[in-house]
Regions:
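Glycine/Thr-rich phosphate-binding loops that ligate phosphate moieties of nucleotide
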Residues: 2-215
Length: 215
């Protein structure tokens, strides 16, 4: 949301008074994020990892995170482009395709896993950078959905983008909560969306960017 109207190439909007009077909405996003990690699990996951998860009675995504966290920041030069279903923002190109770049004999499955995490986070940052170039100052980000369940991924987003990230108690049902906020204002429980949101949205976790990692 912004109090000013301006245009960002590849990002939808601004939509004046879309949510609150006197504010405008910008809409940019990725066509694939958590689904790329699911793709990795379904297609590239080593059988030994699956067996290890069974032996340790561990969620497979937690094990993937553990393996990825053992790889250095920057993934030893391996880069993953997140255009697995095209690019929504800032290029708006449905024909763009994802890739791994920088593979070597030393590349391991853990490198590929970390590259997925980093690539998705950098994809989000690409949208933010485009907005900043147009004059929009992003000060904090609230995340919801499946990706927001991962502390590792949320901290990585904060480190790469360079602003605090927050998740909410209702992050897995954010759409339903939004409906409740609208209804609460509609029936007069709250006088406006600002007060309703302040009262009904509860922050769960905060991720402060590590500026050393950001470099």
């Amino acid at each position: 949301l912004s109090e000013e109207e301006f245009h960002v190439d590849g990002v939808n909007g601004t939509y004046p008074n879309c949510m609150y009077d006197g504010t405008s909405l910008l809409e940019g996003g990725q066509t694939a994020a958590g689904s790329i990690l699911t793709w990795f699990k379904n297609n590239l996951l080593p059988a030994a990892w699956m067996q290890e998860a069974v032996n340790r009675n561990m969620n497979i995504y937690d094990l993937i995170t553990e393996k990825a966290s053992e790889v250095p920041i920057g993934c030893d030069g391996l880069v993953m482009m997140d255009y697995f279903q095209g690019n929504r923002a800032p290029y708006a190109d449905s024909k763009a395709r994802g890739m791994f770049w920088g593979l070597s004999i030393g590349t391991t499955p853990a490198h590929l896993a970390r590259a997925v995490y980093e690539g998705v986070a950098y994809g989000a940052n690409h949208c933010i950078v485009s907005m900043k170039k147009a004059g929009y100052d992003v000060k904090e980000i609230y995340a919801c959905g499946g990706l927001a369940q991962s502390d590792f991924w949320m901290q990585m987003h904060a480190d790469i983008i360079g602003v605090p990230m927050y998740t909410t108690v209702e992050s897995q049902s954010a759409g339903c909560l939004g409906d409740c906020i609208i209804a609460a204002v509609g029936v007069g429980i709250y006088p406006n969306f600002w007060e309703a949101a302040d009262s009904m949205i509860r922050v769960d976790k905060e991720y402060i960017p590590n500026m050393e990692a950001h470099k």
